[in-house]
Swiss-Prot record:
InterPro entries: Pectate_lyase_PlyH/PlyE-like, Pectin_lyas_fold, Pectin_lyase_fold/virulence. GO terms for molecular function: pectate lyase activity. GO terms for biological process: cell wall organization; pectin catabolic process. Binds 1 Ca(2+) ion per subunit. Its cofactor is Ca(2+). This is Probable pectate lyase F.
Length: 234
């Protein structure tokens, strides 16, 4: 369990208060397989009523990177998605074009990335509240924009990274992540941030079994490979 202060994330022990739901993926009320992405307009709310959505058998191509057209849901700026289960048959889970809100969104088996956030600007905030993700061989949350991502009371199991600030986007910037009340089991780092671009991370009441829940990278721009350069400590 850790907390931190921003700028250079410094982790210190705190009282246990991890609130990620540990009862598994909820039982779906219905199942919808769609041939095309579902778009949620700017500022609108899509309440799935605990139905499961996917893109049909064979949609997942492993770690082959897709785009928003391969996602199950595409949220325009300010949109909200809630009470939904994203099934295993998908290449991309949820794409946000600008800041968005996800409330109780569950991913039963992540393919490439569960959540991709892009085109958010400095000062704008994305909220991921409740929900969780299983079997993400790489990232759960991929942050390509320049705002702040808040991850609250989330549950992750069998994952590579819960959050990653883009390591090699063509245009780089400072990004911020705040993680609170989250449980992360059988995985790697909770957050990976780019030290050289001034990223900040705050972890509060996070329960993780990773030896290094917060990792520093040297990010780069374009066709390059970011390098791991250290760990947050305190």
């Amino acid at each position: 369990m850790w907390s931190s202060i921003a700028a250079f994330p410094v982790l210190v022990p705190v009282a246990l208060a991890c609130l990620g739901y540990e009862g598994g993926v909820p039982t779906p009320t219905a199942h919808h397989s769609n041939s095309a992405v579902i778009e949620v307009a700017a500022g609108q709310v899509f309440d799935a009523g605990w139905a499961k959505y996917d893109r049909g058998s064979g949609a997942c191509k492993g770690q082959s990177e897709g785009d928003w057209k391969d996602a199950v849901f595409y949220l325009h700026s300010g949109a909200t998605l809630k009470n939904v289960i994203i099934g295993a048959n998908q290449a991309e889970g949820v794409h946000c074009d600008g800041p968005c809100t996800l409330q109780f969104v569950w991913f039963e088996d992540v393919c490439e990335d569960a959540i991709t956030i892009k085109n958010d600007k400095a000062g704008q905030e994305t909220w991921i509240i409740g929900g969780g993700a299983y079997h993400a061989s790489d990232k759960i949350v991929q942050h390509n924009g320049c705002g702040t991502v808040n991850i609250i009371n989330f549950y992750a199991e069998d994952y590579g990274k819960v959050y990653r600030s883009c390591g090699n986007c063509d245009k780089q910037c400072k990004r911020n992540v705040y993680v609170e009340g989250t449980t992360a089991r059988n995985g790697g780092e909770v957050v990976g941030i780019n030290l050289n671009y001034g990223d900040t991370a705050t972890l509060k009441n996070v329960c993780a079994d990773s030896a290094h829940p917060c990792v520093f990278y040297d990010g780069c721009a374009g066709d390059c490979e970011p390098k791991k350069v250290g760990y947050c400590s305190g």
